[in-house]
Design a protein with these regions (language model features):
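Active-site-adjacent beta->alpha loops and helix N-cap segments on the catalytic face
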Residues: 16-22, 41-55, 121-128, 147-158
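Hydrophobic faces of well-ordered beta-strands that scaffold small-molecule active sites
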Residues: 5-9, 33-35, 61-65, 108-112, ...
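Hydrophobic, well-structured mid-protein blocks that either form specific transmembrane helices
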Residues: 102-150
Length: 215
């Protein structure tokens, strides 16, 4: 059985007078990009420019919606209701879809950002609302979600195309979630170790957790 591995990166995080990241260089090495939608990062001009660059370099475009938390880069927990989560999705995906339409680019996928991503992995009513919002904007858009999570299983149940995501540079807990950034073992900094972990995840469907257990 053959596998297609998509190399993916978050992009479009600059805004106003602030330049973050090296987007044009990164685009030479990835096959898809998650474009910030203006709340945790990005702005309308950056969103448009990023879509154009992705088209020029043949990189698939995905939406990267987050919490309305520019100061915290969307990584802080927020008390969000299902209605709010659904509206957040429609608002941000709708904006990026508009730029994709302008340049005749397919909006291939959606990947949540930061605390929004983490919440949807473990909170069923938020995950349901996220998928409701996705389907309201474009039912053909794939859901890029944490492999084995609730939202991954619910998306598959609904018939939404799913991209099972694994991380090369992040640690995993025994529950299959990401180790919080504030805790030891959250990041894999050695390139060789990251490569070996990716190969295990892709070839064997397993990962070594922060406790040393293989799941």
């Amino acid at each position: 059985m053959s596998h297609y591995i998509d190399l993916n990166s978050d992009l479009g995080e600059s805004f106003g007078n602030y330049t973050l990241g090296m987007d044009s260089e990164v685009l030479n090495h990835v096959t898809s990009a998650n474009v910030a939608c203006g709340w945790h990062a990005g702005d309308p001009l950056i969103m448009e420019a990023t879509v154009k660059m992705c088209k020029e370099k043949g990189v698939a475009v995905g939406a990267h919606p987050g919490y309305p938390d520019l100061m915290g880069f969307g990584r802080r927990k927020m008390a969000v209701s299902p209605d709010e989560a659904r509206a957040y999705m429609i608002y941000q995906l709708g904006a990026l879809q508009g730029f994709c339409n302008q340049y005749d680019v397919e909006l291939q996928h959606m990947k949540l950002h930061g605390a929004f991503y983490n919440m949807a992995c473990v909170t069923p009513d938020i995950a349901d609302a996220v998928l409701d919002g996705l389907q309201a904007v474009n039912s053909k858009v794939r859901a890029m979600v944490l492999s084995g999570s609730y939202i991954a299983k619910e998306a598959e149940r609904r018939g939404i195309p799913v991209i099972q995501e694994v991380f090369a540079d992040r640690g995993y807990t025994e529950e299959g979630t990401l180790v919080p950034r504030t805790e030891e073992g959250a990041f894999i900094k050695d390139p060789q170790e990251a490569l070996e972990r990716v190969l295990m995840m892709v070839q064997e469907g397993k990962v070594v957790t922060n406790t040393g257990k293989t799941i």
